[in-house]
Amino acid sequence: MFEKPVVKTFQYGNHTVTLETGVMARQATAAVMATMDDTAVFVSVVGKKEAVVGQDFFPLTVNYQERTYAAGKIPGGFFKREGRPSEGETLIARLIDRPIRPLFPDGFTNEVQVIATVVSVNPDVQPDIISMIGTSAALAISGLPFNGPIGAARVGHIDGQLVLNPSEKELKQSRLDLVVAGTDNAVLMVESEAQILTEEEMLAAVVFGHDQQQAVIKAINEFAAEVATPAWEWVAPAENTELKAKVAALAETRLVEAYQITEKMARYDRIHEISAEVTAALLAENEALDTKEIHTIFHDLEKTVVRRSIIAGNPRIDGREKDMVRALDVRTGVLPRTHGSALFTRGETQALVTATLGTQRDAQIIDELTGEKKDHFLLHYNFPPYCVGETGFVGSPKRREIGHGRLAKRGIAAVMPSPEEFPYTVRVVSEITESNGSSSMASVCGSSLALMDAGVPIKASVAGIAMGLVKEENDFVVLSDILGDEDHLGDMDFKVAGTATGVTALQMDIKIEGITKEIMQIALNQAKGARLHILSVMDQAISAARSDISEFAPRIHTMKISVEKIKDVIGKGGAVIRQLTEETGTTIEIEDDGTIKIAATDGDQAKEAIRRIQEITAEVEVGVIYTGKVARLADFGAFVTILPGKDGLVHISQIADKRVEKVSDYLTEGQEVQVKVLEIDRQGRVRLSMKEAVETSDAAAAEVAPQAE
């Protein structure tokens, strides 16, 4: 029934990788089962043979989905099936998309969909790298006009050594988690998080990852040669040179003038005017012309005008030199009731960032294929339409917002205190209120400021900067603090976050080949200069965490009890701890090692909760006099509660120093009495005496009396 499947197996570092096609999804354009040491991802590619007429963009969709059966689990929830993509799935979909998108040719507008499904998971091998390798292999055998294949590698930094594709266990000891993807001669994408490494160490990791992944590219080329799928008969649309010349004649000089306008919205208005005038003039001349084609040519001309000006060494769109950072404005404590807040403005990009402190109970529980984990540091990024002067849908976060939020979080994570140092869950929210490039890096700066304003003891201030590149043949210019237009019209988007001493996050997206190690080195060094400048301005506003947290934030008090006493504090069915939290107005969390964390906005409430827990966990001591409450009467004596949950028996013979006929003649339930602990037997039963408590008290009073005279 099946033709002989094509299987390619190769060694990749410590892992064995297998690529297989020809058995499953034979109606798809291409499909590959990619396996790396029992982690298997099934990748399908479908490309439409016909493009939508008049479409001027490339409709590539990448879906990444994790199936719980891959880890031998059944999904939770009422419906017991997978739902919408998780944040982790969205981030990996972006990771696959970013390096493959620039490898499709300009003018190719056929719809392409990539679906990567995780079908088996080895907990020690993350599925992202093998998903990227599987996607590359599927595209390589699809026949689509794809200028690949790409390789992918994860790089760790352990004990001063670079490690290829570290295991989950190794990653916990690593100072670096870097993913790099590229072709045989170019790096295309970098995504990383680091524990404050130098620029040289980061660059070495990128180069190492790119060198190591050549084994993947070689194997995929051999795999594709064996499959031998015929290439699509796709020809790039012919360039309309006549229309191009007409648009240039009408618009070029005016566009050069328009790009002298430094204010973003005024510049956009002028460019739209020119576009409308050029379109109207050309349609008046020939009604048969395609408006979309005119707009595409006009946009290409814009790109040419800006790039040519930058390469020529002219001032940038907003009048800056290549290595200048826009004007900065830094404010902290801008919102009265939040736990921490900051407003960070860089040129026409602005972020309002808040920090909120919560208890361990507020931590996010993340249910991954490899197991459940808790995240005590959350960072959310919002990009509302008004920040770019537009109207639009406001709802759940889009892929871009999730990606930018994760990048900002990576930038800050290295300086966050450990849960032992600061036992709070921290949520940072960045609201982008204005945007003209590099809003994710503004979020990094604003987050650092808001955390310090909230009193979170972060290790150092963190700033982020976005770099750009314009390259024409052998000439290139690296730009610091790029505008949105420079990002859109340039060849590289290169974001670096870090402290004064090193890098905490690096993200690179490169649209062209030929970005050398030297160019990346120049960009990293230029980024360092810009970062240090921004940090100096931030430090003038706030250079260290405030000595105390906000009066509106919960204060967490920590105490330790014996592990055996945990059950006493919780009580049967949680009755004791529930009563404690309700009556004291606090939040109480108990850990397995006996650590108790009490959170309260009022200090007196916390003190009361601590006092009551100390009472519950206190040990009864022989010879000590306690003030107790009569809990129950019996014919042979009375049971008295001397500590919460601890009763003892006062035998009828120990109630008074004379004969007692009836217990109820001397005691009533609820009565407070003083009792002395006589004995605790092997079974933990407590024997009490009222008469000895009176005798001891009288003796103590007699000793004190002479001194009183």
From Swiss-Prot:
Function: Involved in mRNA degradation. Catalyzes the phosphorolysis of single-stranded polyribonucleotides processively in the 3'- to 5'-direction.
Domain KH: 554-613
Binding sites annotated in the UniProt record for Mg(2+): 487, 493
InterPro entries assigned to the protein according to its UniProt record, in alphabetical order: ExoRNase_PH_dom1 (IPR001247), ExoRNase_PH_dom2 (IPR015847), ExoRNase_PH_dom2_sf (IPR036345), KH_dom (IPR004087), KH_dom_type_1 (IPR004088), KH_dom_type_1_sf (IPR036612), NA-bd_OB-fold (IPR012340), PNPase (IPR012162)
Subcellular location: Cytoplasm
Domain of life: Bacteria
SMART domains membership: KH (SM00322), S1 (SM00316)
Pfam families: KH_1, PNPase, RNase_PH, RNase_PH_C, S1
Residue ranges of every copy of the S1 motif domain listed in the record: 623-691
The species this protein was found in: Vibrio cholerae serotype O1 (strain ATCC 39315 / El Tor Inaba N16961)
Cofactor requirements of the protein: Mg(2+)
Protein name: Polyribonucleotide nucleotidyltransferase
Membrane-crossing residue ranges in chain numbering: none
Keyword S-adenosyl-L-methionine attached: no
GO molecular function annotations of the record: 3'-5'-RNA exonuclease activity; magnesium ion binding; polyribonucleotide nucleotidyltransferase activity; RNA binding
Keyword RNA-binding (UniProt): yes
Enzyme Commission designation: 2.7.7.8
Subunit structure: Component of the RNA degradosome, which is a multiprotein complex involved in RNA processing and mRNA degradation.
Gene for this chain: pnp
GO BP term, pick one: RNA catabolic process
